[in-house]
Amino acid sequence: MQTSETGSDTGSTVTLQTSVASQAAVPTQVVQQVPVQQQVQQVQTVQQVQHVYPAQVQYVEGSDTVYTNGAIRTTTYPYTETQMYSQNTGGNYFDTQGSSAQVTTVVSSHSMVGTGGIQMGVTGGQLISSSGGTYLIGNSMENSGHSVTHTTRASPATIEMAIETLQKSDGLSTHRSSLLNSHLQWLLDNYETAEGVSLPRSTLYDHYLRHCQEHKLDPVNAASFGKLIRSIFMGLRTRRLGTRGNSKYHYYGIRVKPDSPLNRLQEDMQYMAMRQQPMQQKQRYKPMQKVDGVADGFTGSGQQTGTSVEQTVIAQSQHHQQFLDASRALPEFGEVEISSLPDGTTFEDIKSLQSLYREHCEAILDVVVNLQFSLIEKLWQTFWRYSPSTPTDGTTITESSNLSEIESRLPKAKLITLCKHESILKWMCNCDHGMYQALVEILIPDVLRPIPSALTQAIRNFAKSLEGWLSNAMNNIPQRMIQTKVAAVSAFAQTLRRYTSLNHLAQAARAVLQNTSQINQMLNDLNRVDFANVQEQASWVCQCDDNMVQRLETDFKMTLQQQSTLEQWAAWLDNVMMQALKPYEGRPSFPKAARQFLLKWSFYSSMVIRDLTLRSAASFGSFHLIRLLYDEYMFYLVEHRVAQATGETPIAVMGEFGDLNAVSPGNLDKDEGSEVESEMDEELDDSSEPQAKREKTELSQAFPVGCMQPVLETGVQPSLLNPIHSEHIVTSTQTIRQCSATGNTYTAV
């Protein structure tokens, strides 16, 4: 605002300018003062103006002169640029909250047109321009034809206006008004407006009561809380949603922010409700679409109970689906390459097996998209013609019509015969790898994106049950087929466990990387580390180039100093991996070199952590957390890079040693032509180490980094242990080695 005064009797001229950041073509109004003699009959003594009047608004400036709204003449100076604000014919509105020494310019209602062509209609609103910024304060837009989507935090003026409104309507005291400021900030931090979504009013109030309880604040009543929400989030509408007799009022147009901790609270409450649900009710859920012709057989009576618990689970499932990538589809399955038919089978039987298995995999994908994991066990039992040896209650798993239909297309006897053929085994293994990779990308499309804790726990429970479900469903199938199928599903389960753990670490580390004080402490502690000594000790094992290690150290410190986001760190790790493996691209030794890089990365990072531990670094906990995250994410990157280089899926790469019969010295030497392995073989042959120690070294190279993680979580399962091979029995010692996909186990005899 600029104020110029003259000594004339006609008074001074007050120039009001509305300054809007990055806005063009705003008309400037020059308000001229009218002589005092013309105002005598219009003067009214007003101590304080509390409300906005459309016909009579006064400026009180100083203690002598009073100007009335009706006697002010205005002149508009238009700009030549395109006008972004066009004046309506409505009356002018002025803010009178400021002191006499400060005048705030208020522009009347406008039709705002953004440069992007997005219109925002505001009826009865105000544009307030002050030294703190430009704010839009408007009334409720219940019947407005336009909608305003708030994507940023409301202005301080909006918060003050909301508190003032509650003070007038409810007579709040000054102490209560100060408490409202924290309540309003909590609302703005955890909620946002959005189109097409709604939240129950009771849910919002429950969240508010919990917040007040945790912070020992006095809550307002539900009615005042409703006014508070409407004053902050303008444009909210109220709808009554739900079935007859069980409907509730909802705020339409508001949702919990994706990064709000209320998401985890809400999911945990829904998960507990699901855990308390009776088992017979859980089995009544059926997919949104009839799957593989067996959905009706799993629904019991097929009737909805209408209980609130079921509605909670259904709502939870629908809410979780927004975190999935339902656009994924099954890849095309290749043809069965078979030269000679097994006895008693025809090519029609093979085609029937292909079509049935395709339908079976599509059914699995459908129930996973709908988060009905328990139905997968029934689908497996149906396809493999599960027949329990001792029926418990005389009930059947599926309807006889469904089984008879599948039996008519491919009898079980022929299915068992085909399962013994090597070509069928290989074809079905490839199909499983493609299907499981699609399921992983559906459930966890982005390992760094936050996932609700209830969904994470459901996925981990699902992964824990997979092997048992499949083994039980294939009780009458040839053992070779069972081993092939279990190896693939084990790789799938292990991938789900790893990715959910990686996601959990990512969310924990995200908070650390956003904390400025922790970042500064980490930098100070890292600068005290003697990297020359670390490199000297690690060089004997890693044999890394000194210049490359020094460059990584510099880049790491610079990235940390810039307070990079988690996504920027992920890009940095990907660049490190690409640079390290670039010399091996297009060579047969690439998978082996990738595994060696993982080992070297893990060893070098452990040396840095050791130095921080010995120095009692204050930020040791933060470094330990991000070290775990970076190791896991580097494993994730290498896994996908090897899959890309070999033309396979990451599930197939991880399941390479999942087939336990394949773990033999002959298969471990399949990269015999690679330079890396040849050098290691020569060093082992020339060494004078005992045979048992050399064999231990060879076998340990076959397993990727992190293979012991499932062992730490669930232990080695007996069903995954290899039959004892004679070549693993060392006659000079009393040790028998048993190898599994999850690590090495030694049993003394």
Swiss-Prot record:
Protein origin, superkingdom: Eukaryota
UniProt region (Disordered), positions on chain: 663-699
Cellular location(s): Nucleus
UniProtKB keywords: Developmental protein, Differentiation, DNA-binding, Nucleus, Repressor, Transcription, Transcription regulation
Biased composition (Acidic residues): 674-688
DNA-binding region: 183-258
GO terms classed as biological process: cell differentiation; cilium-dependent cell motility; DNA-templated transcription; endocrine pancreas development; epithelial cilium movement involved in determination of left/right asymmetry; regulation of DNA-templated transcription; regulation of insulin secretion
Main location: nucleus
Signal peptide as annotated in the record: none
One Gene Ontology term, aspect cellular component: nucleus
Example of a GO MF term: DNA-binding transcription factor activity, RNA polymerase II-specific
Function summary: Transcription factor required for ciliogenesis and islet cell differentiation during endocrine pancreas development. Essential for the differentiation of nodal monocilia and left-right asymmetry specification during embryogenesis. Required for the biogenesis of motile cilia by governing growth and beating efficiency of motile cells. Also required for ciliated ependymal cell differentiation. Regulates the expression of genes involved in ciliary assembly (DYNC2LI1, FOXJ1 and BBS4) and genes involved in ciliary motility (DNAH11, DNAH9 and DNAH5).
PANTHER family cross-referenced by the UniProt entry: RFX TRANSCRIPTION FACTOR FAMILY, TRANSCRIPTION FACTOR RFX3
Quaternary context: Heterodimer; heterodimerizes with RFX1 and RFX2, and RFX6.
Family note: Belongs to the RFX family.
Protein name, entry field: Transcription factor RFX3
Originating species: Macaca fascicularis (Crab-eating macaque)
